[in-house]
Each structure stands twice: as C-alpha cells, then as structure tokens.
Regions:
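C-terminal non-catalytic regions of proteins with extracellular/luminal or membrane-system context
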Residues: 2, 8-18, 33, 59-74, ...
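Short acidic/histidine-rich active-site segments
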Residues: 3-20, 24, 38, 42, ...
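Active-site mouth loops of central-metabolism enzymes
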Residues: 23-34
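Short, well-structured alpha-helical segments that form the helix of a local strand-helix-strand
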Residues: 40-41, 79-88, 321, 338
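Long, well-ordered, tryptophan-enriched scaffold segments
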Residues: 47, 54, 58-98
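An alpha-helix initiation/capping motif
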Residues: 81, 85, 114-121
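Flexible hinge/switch segments at interdomain interfaces of large molecular machines
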Residues: 95-105, 203-206
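Histidine-centered catalytic/metal-binding microenvironments
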Residues: 103-116
Length: 384
C-alpha cells in the first residue's frame, strides 16, 4: 500500500508468555514456541519498525544475526536501515537534531497556558451528560432539581471498593476513598458529616466493575471464566451462550469459555448501597447521583431513587460540580447505549452497533445513543 510511515507493535508481544492464563504480561500469541529473537525477526521481516514497550536490544541484535544467516547480511542490513530511516525522518521533521534544546521561558508560555487549559476544561464540560433531572423536588421556578442552589449543606458519602485486579492482573486490596478528597469548594456549599444535617446528598459512583476470571472456579473444575456484569448486585448469566465464540489458548485444555449459569458481583457493589442508603436517610430531600461511566451500566437498580443523574467519562470533579451547581448548562449526549437489563446485554449481537434494548427511566426518557438533557429538558433529537 506504499505506506512510508512507522509500523509499531503493541506492547509486550515478543517476550515469553505468562505460564497461566491468569497473567496478562507478555502476549506472543501463536508464536509461543519460537525464541524471542525468532519472534522479533518474524516481525521485522513482516514490516515492523519498532517494538512497543521493548527496551532490550539483545533480542533485536540476535534477530539480526539469525536473519543474516537466513537471508544474507546485505538483505538484513538493508531491512534494518529502512526502519532506521523511517524512525529518523520523524525526528528530522521535528528539527530535533538541528535544534534539540528548549527555551524554558517559551515552554512555560505554551505548556499548560491559560488558553489551552480553558479549551481543555470546556471540552470536559461539554462531554458531561445529564441523564435525569426530576421536577419532583425541584426548587420553585426550576424545571428540575438541578442546578442546585449554592450555599446548601451537602452530604457526600465515602466509596467502599472491594478487592479487585489491576490491568496486569495484580491484586488490589479493598479500600475506602473520599470522592472529593480536596473537599467541597466553599463557593458551592458546606459539606456535612451525615444525611440528617444535609439539604442534599451528592453520591459519586462508578459504573459496575468486576473480575471476569476466577482461579477458584478453575480449581473447582470450571473453566475459570465468569460473566462481566454491568449491574451492581449479583448477576447470574441465564441467557449467555452455551458455547463461547472464542477459545483455544495454548495454556488451556478446552475451547469453550462459556460462563452460562455462573454468577458474578461487582466489586464496587457498595456504590449502589450508598445511593439506596442516602435515599432512605434523606427522606424528602434530593439525592443527586454523579456516575463515572467506564462502560455501559444497568440503571434500573437505582435510577428511580435518584432525583438527578449526571454521567461523566473521566473528567475533573470541578467540571462535574459546575453542572450540578449551575456553572455549566449541560450539552452532552450519550456516546453509548444504556441497556435495559443484563438480558439485553447477553442478547445483543457482538458485531452490530446500536442493537441493544435500552433503558427507559421513571420519567419516560430513553437512555439511547445520543440522548441527553439540559436544565430545561431533553435535548432535541439529532438531525440525520
């Protein structure tokens, strides 16, 4: 295709594989019987210029030697110099050889400058989606409970998170965390220690997260695979596939990874408890839910208990508080569908977009792709 740029691999694809499927370190799938140098040579001869995350030169040097024996030194040198040329061209284009030094004063004017930070913060605000804004406990003169008036007494419960796994399957202990460790800015109101003292509860949650693999299940004769749950309470997969689509890892003696009939629970299940407990304790006072959405989530477990729901996708707390307290009238729309329930998740087609039965809340709003609200009501439908 006459591509003249750099081909860089994903991270960790040439090293020897982990001994068990539980590990998620090196991933040399399909070439696990080769040496690391042989894997590198295979990649190089197929057009790879750079190995992501690899700082060891030894296997590359060994790959060159093997290549010289196999293809001849002239051919291997030409191939290595081609990658060197591609890599160096980008550096030349940046002028880093001609002028490798930075002017600290000039850098200070550019990096983190007011203009760039303003644009970044505005992008955060624009991405926030107001899913629900009930009029039931709205102040006089407002169509919904949001924006909150400033100067209120606000209760914000701590989050309790159970034991979990990090990205590389490292064990993480249970923890308790304050969702606003720097405190509630005084311009918004006063944070209080109990729902009884508060005018409003502000509950920060994250979408349900779980561990989809169990060594205990494997030891007990299962295949180790558990359902990925998008709800907080225990989920039993009654409508999952009997036979999985994928399977056949060289470290497993089976190909069916089905989790049909198995149960899993979100390790942040206590997020749901916080909402329900606040609803009971607050009585007729409003409960506002602010959800960090890392993946689609089942809303029916708590939606009816919340007066307002604000969804964000990894922005600063300051941007969220702007929406809650009237500093920014939300404009964001859902970039995903929120499923009606876990059956809808299991029944959707993995390779088809926007085919899921979506959740309709207690106000009659459909949490479909493109849905969102502002303080006045539901945003107008997108023009196709």
């Amino acid at each position: 295709y006459e591509f003249k740029g750099i081909v860089c691999t994903d991270w960790g694809i040439t090293q020897d594989p982990e001994k068990t499927i539980e590990g998620f370190g090196s991933r040399c799938y399909g070439v696990q019987d080769m040496t690391e140098a042989e894997r590198c040579l295979l990649a190089i001869t197929n057009g790879v210029d750079q190995f992501g995350g690899n700082s060891e030169s030894g296997p590359i040097v060994e790959a060159y030697k093997i290549g010289c024996e196999k293809y001849g030194e002239k051919a291997m040198r030409e191939r290595m110099e081609l990658s060197a040329k591609r890599l160096l061209i980008n550096i030349f284009h940046c002028g880093l050889f001609e002028d490798p030094y930075l002017d600290p004063e000039e850098s200070a004017k550019i990096v983190g400058c007011e203009e760039f930070c303003r644009h970044g913060y505005e992008a955060q605000q624009k991405s926030i989606v107001l899913l629900k804004n009930s009029a039931k406990r709205a102040p006089e003169g407002q169509k919904g409970v949001l924006p909150l008036k400033k100067g209120l007494k606000v209760y914000i419960p701590e989050r309790k998170i159970g034991p979990s796994k990090a990205f590389f399957r490292i064990d993480l202990p249970a923890k308790t965390e304050d969702p606003l460790p720097d405190g509630l800015p005084s311009k918004y109101g006063t944070r209080v220690a109990s729902p009884e003292e508060a005018d409003v509860a502000l509950v920060f949650i994250e979408s349900p997260a779980c561990n989809p693999y169990s060594t205990k299940d494997l030891a007990n004769g299962g295949n180790g695979y558990l359902p990925i749950t998008l709800q907080y309470r225990p989920y039993t997969a009654k409508k999952a596939r009997e036979v999985s689509i994928a399977g056949g890892d060289f470290r497993e003696n089976f190909t069916n990874r089905s989790y049909l009939g198995k149960t899993n629970t979100a390790y942040n299940e206590a997020d749901l408890d916080n909402i329900l407990e606040c609803r009971r304790a607050m009585g007729d006072k409003p409960v506002i839910v602010c959800a960090t959405v890392n993946n689609p989530m089942v809303m029916h477990e708590f939606e009816a208990e919340a007066d307002a729901i604000v969804a964000e996708f990894g922005v600063s707390r300051a941007a969220v508080l702007d929406v809650v307290f009237g500093g920014y009238n939300p404009t964001g729309r859902l970039p995903i569908q929120m499923p009606k329930d876990m059956d809808a998740v299991e029944e959707q087609s993995e390779d088809r977009a926007l085919d899921m039965e979506t959740y309709i809340d207690s106000e009659g709003h459909n949490y479909d792709y493109g849905y969102g609200m502002n303080y006045e009501g539901v945003l107008p439908a997108w023009k196709k």
